[in-house]
Design a protein with these regions (language model features):
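Short, acidic Ser/Thr/Gly-rich low-complexity loop/linker segments typical of extracellular
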Residues: 47-62
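A short, solvent-exposed loop/turn motif at the edges and junctions
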Residues: 48-50, 76-87, 448-449
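N-terminal, polar/Ser/Thr-rich
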Residues: 113-374, 472-474, 806-811
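Hydrophobic helix-coil surface modules that form long, contiguous segments used
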Residues: 340-345, 349-389, 394-397, 402, ...
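Amphipathic alpha-helical substructures
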Residues: 385, 690, 728-729, 734-839
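Beta-strand-rich binding/interaction modules
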Residues: 389-391, 397-407, 760, 802, ...
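Zinc-dependent metallopeptidase catalytic helix centered on the HExxH motif
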Residues: 460, 471, 475-476, 484, ...
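Acidic/His/Gly-enriched intrinsically disordered linker/tail segments
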Residues: 670, 674-749, 775-776
């Protein structure tokens, strides 16, 4: 499942010694008339290249390769509407070539955008913000400025305001001596800070602060300034360094903060300020970039309404980030609501953070024969607050916007800097819309890197949620009207229901509609064959799409090549049908009546969209086939294959039927889907299910508790509720192992303590149906799930005597304690042939307030059967007696690993 990122991958590049690669191939691409051709694809292969180099010609038809060794190279140049040109060159010195592409025979017409983009980055106010310089400077001495939980002490120095833009000052530069203090607003965030820096508050001396703010925040600085003085040279240099730093995008992130702040969805600060300049009532914000004595790039943000870190989907307004990708202290140090909200009792993770709400998208996409994408998206939206003119979209920076139009067909200004810059896409309305009224804009865009060829007929879909201008990510649901035009040998499988298919010359056209609003749109693409499977129990229409050829990186697996893809697909569809039936029984109906199971050319990655699932090739193999492939069974990989299909199918409920409110609550999606995979192993697998089921929970326990090379276990990295903030250089894979594995355990433990010998899972099933039904039209939060659980709790679960499950959620969601259990028992003959079971149970390695209900099992010769559960509090030992009808073969505590323990 996407995004937010689900797995964060850090790739480190080794620098190649420059004296080994000294030559380049450059040139221009033109048509027969001499007109230059932009966006032509140039693929270079040859001397010692382990993989092709792929370039695109710029708006002037120019291209230039990186440094190459001397030798023979083949250039393959392609562009939709032209014949492909293949040319071989001998590289001895630097080469500059002029290449001409012949116009191809008539085919489906694709409009190639013009070279000039007069409305791109051309809004006059935006241009002024982009080039803003220094204004007046004032001396500052022993001035203190407080912004929520943080205090800036400007002990000695100068404060230089930036020049006004449209009459508004949007920033300042402090040079001198100062001190920064941050005191967390809550105990939970103080604990998180202590885990990171071994201190419960932040203290940092600084010599430089760059401030960017809205007009309201600027007024606070006038209370502490002295007399006007000459601008210091250091201020101009500091501003230039700041511009260079925050405007640079890193395509391959080295750290979590680099991914957030300088990655694909990075902010364009000037465009954010443009929104505030155009709307005086824009939600106020302040960004402070602190050059400290110990930490050279601390960033303190206060952003009301939209959240301090929109890239993290954060409901909190206040953040402190240590941006230092090369340091072990890199990370999000602090993220919380404003202190005033806690004082008023108004702090909430469920506030609407959107500025605009989207009702529908109509997207027409053409994929050319060289995998280039051309699209037009009509986006229907309504303003949610007054006065806003600037809309920020999520869009892959390699997809270049060519034109933005309003509903009347008039061109609109838009912002999208270069691919390697702060190239996020913003549209600028010609005037502010009226709150609650419907509006529409049309966005035309094109580019590469949405698709990557994996083999003959197979592709990786890389830009999974950013292949179209997405206004609010997973934060809202909208209707989608999707039309795809692709080379006719290929097939698109999309979210929604297929409305029609046709062929236009060499292109296949398909039209899809979502019958109800969904959070995101996606598609799979390749040379697919189709197989269908009926589900008479749920009425679900299940379709499988499989590839007939292996991707290039799996060609060495000859055993896989010999397996029948259709029968392998039938295996995956059988698993899908079983999981659909199981989830429908336990959780209720999903919002969809069909599901498309599509093979993707990846061996170890799956993902779920609304009624569309990507499965890795490995999911199509059973244990016998995996033995044929590898000659042995790797327990970890075998576990992944067992879990991936039921996990991804379960996302039709967890993530799509029920969304999540913020990064704090993503465990309700990933953890619940992981739990559903375990439920599948227990309920839907014939034969000896106990072995696979117990091994599943053993694997999860190991993922939660096993320490990494820094001696830190995922569980010790922080509570589930911290979500993506668990990511740091020292904690490594903590986010995945806590959110997925411990999240699954939380739901399993609720199931365990709700279980009764008479009704078994009846109360749990009622709770899960209620949870799904009550959250079909709104995102779920940890607290809203807790409220549903409390409606269905039994008397034995009320360990605090107040009808609440605070004790459970404080321990397992907001806390990190995990108990250790030990049991000794005696079997004592009783009257009438019965046996008294005397148990001594010890709970340890927790505090005195920790309470839990632990299940007890006995085996009378037919396998372990549950006879009840024992409540125990703190580090203590308690005894209990139970009268049994006969002598058991064995007695065990927590026999099926229902409770997480050490």
């Amino acid at each position: 499942m996407p995004f937010v990122p689900k797995l964060v991958l850090f790739i480190f590049w080794l620098t190649v010694s420059s004296h080994l690669l000294a030559e380049t191939i450059s040139g221009t691409i033109s048509d027969p008339s001499g007109a230059l051709i932009p966006a032509a694809r140039i693929e270079i292969t040859g001397t010692d290249l382990s993989q092709p180099i792929v370039l695109s010609s710029d708006s002037e038809g120019r291209f230039s390769s990186p440094d190459l060794k001397p030798g023979s190279y083949t250039l393959r140049i392609s562009r939709d509407g032209f014949e492909t040109l293949v040319k071989t060159l001998e590289l001895k010195d630097k080469l500059n070539v002029r290449l001409s592409l012949a116009i191809s025979k008539p085919r489906v017409q694709v409009e190639v955008p013009g070279k000039k983009l007069p409305y791109a980055n051309s809004d006059p106010v935006y241009r002024s913000l982009r080039s803003v310089g220094l204004g007046t400077t004032y001396s500052v001495s022993n001035a203190t400025f407080s912004f929520d939980t943080a205090t800036f002490q400007f002990q000695k120095g100068t404060l230089t305001f930036l020049s006004p833009v449209n009459g508004v000052v949007t920033g300042a530069v402090f040079i001198g001596e100062g001190h920064f203090t941050l005191k967390p607003a809550t105990a939970l965030d103080a604990q998180e800070l202590k885990r990171r820096i071994s201190a419960s508050q932040v203290e940092e001396d600084f010599t430089e602060v760059i401030l960017r703010f809205t007009a309201e925040e600027r007024r606070k600085f006038f209370l502490g300034i002295g007399e006007q003085v000459q601008n210091p040279a250091e201020a101009a240099a500091a501003l230039d360094r700041w511009k260079d730093r925050v405007r640079k995008r890193h395509e391959v992130a080295q750290s979590f903060t680099e991914q957030l702040l300088q990655g694909e969805t990075m902010d364009n600060v000037d465009a954010d300020l443009l929104a505030a300049v155009y709307n005086p009532a824009h939600p106020p914000f302040i960004n402070a970039y602190i050059r400290g004595s110990k930490h050279k790039d601390l960033r303190y943000f206060i952003r009301t309404r939209v959240g301090a870190l929109p890239q993290l989907d954060s409901p909190e307004e206040v953040a402190l980030i240590n941006y230092d990708p090369d340091s072990m202290e890199d990370g999000v140090w602090y993220l919380d609501h404003m202190g005033a909200e806690y004082q008023k009792g108004t702090a909430s993770d469920e506030e609407d953070r959107r500025l605009f709400g989207t009702s529908s998208y109509k997207i027409e996409t053409v994929i050319s024969k060289n995998d280039h994408l051309f699209s037009q998206a009509v986006i229907n939206f309504r303003p949610l607050i007054d006065g806003e003119r600037v809309l920020k979209f999520g869009l892959l920076p390699n997809l270049r916007v060519m034109r933005v139009l309003d509903a009347q067909g008039q061109d609109l200004y838009f912002v999208q800097e270069g691919r390697k810059e702060d190239g996020s896409f913003y549209a600028v309305l010609s005037k502010a819309g009226e709150k609650g009224k419907d509006y529409a804009i049309t966005v035309q865009y094109e580019g590469d890197k949405v698709l990557e060829k994996a083999g003959d007929g197979s592709f990786y879909v890389r830009a999974r949620s950013s292949w179209y201008p997405n206004l609010n990510g997973f934060g809202e649901r909208a209707l989608y009207d999707l039309t795809y035009k692709v080379p006719k040998r290929y097939k698109v499988i999309s979210v929604g229901n297929l409305q029609s298919e046709s062929v236009e010359q060499d292109f296949a056209v398909s039209h899809w509609l979502t019958p109800a609003p969904v959070a995101v749109a996606g598609f799979n693409y390749g040379q697919y064959q189709k197989l269908e499977l009926a589900d008479e129990v749920t009425g679900y229409k299940i379709s499988g799409y499989y590839l007939t050829e292996l991707p290039d990186d799996l060609h060495n697996f000859q055993a896989l090549r010999s397996m029948a893809p259709q029968s392998m697909t039938k295996y995956a569809l059988d698993q899908t049908r079983a999981q659909v039936q199981l989830c429908t029984h336990y959780f209720g109906k999903s919002p969809f009546d069909r599901i498309y199971i599509t093979e993707q050319p990846n061996f170890a990655f799956g993902q779920s969209w609304p009624n569309l699932v990507y499965l890795p090739i490995s999911a199509y193999t059973d244990s016998t086939q995996r033995w044929m492939l590898f000659g042995n069974i790797n327990a970890s990989f075998n576990g992944f294959v067992q879990e991936v299909t039921p996990h991804e199918v379960a996302h039709q409920w967890w993530g799509h039927a029920v969304g999540w409110a913020s990064y704090h609550d993503q465990w309700l999606s990933e953890g619940f889907a992981e739990f559903s995979a375990g439920l599948f192993l227990q309920q839907a697998v014939a034969g000896n299910w106990r072995k696979d089921y117990i091994e599943f929970w053993d694997r999860l326990q190991k993922r939660i508790l096993e320490k990494n090379n820094f001696g830190i276990s995922p569980n010790d990295s922080g509570p589930i509720w911290m979500g993506l903030r668990l990511i740091s250089p020292r904690t490594e894979n903590a986010y995945q192992n806590v959110t997925y594995a411990k999240g699954a355990y939380v739901l399993q433990m609720l199931r365990s303590i709700m279980y009764s010998p008479d009704d078994q899972d009846k109360a749990f099933i009622a709770m899960m149906h209620d949870f799904v039904d009550s959250h079909r039209d709104k995102p779920a939060s940890t607290e809203s799930f807790k409220a549903v659980a409390e409606k269905h709790m039994s008397k034995i679960m009320d360990l605090s005597g107040n009808g609440k499950l605070d004790w459970f959620f404080n321990e397992w969601v907001y806390g990190t304690q995990i108990p250790r259990y030990h049991m000794e028992y005696q079997l004592i003959p009783a009257e009438a042939g019965k046996v008294k079971l005397h148990m001594t149970i010890t709970q340890s390695e927790v505090d005195d307030h920790f309470v839990m209900l632990v299940p007890v099992f006995v085996d009378f010769g037919k396998g372990m059967a549950r006879i009840g559960q024992v409540g125990i509090a703190g580090n203590t030992t308690r005894t209990a007696d139970v009268l049994l009808p006969e002598k058991p073969k064995k007695v065990a505590l927590n026999a099926y690993k229902d409770i997480l323990e050490r």
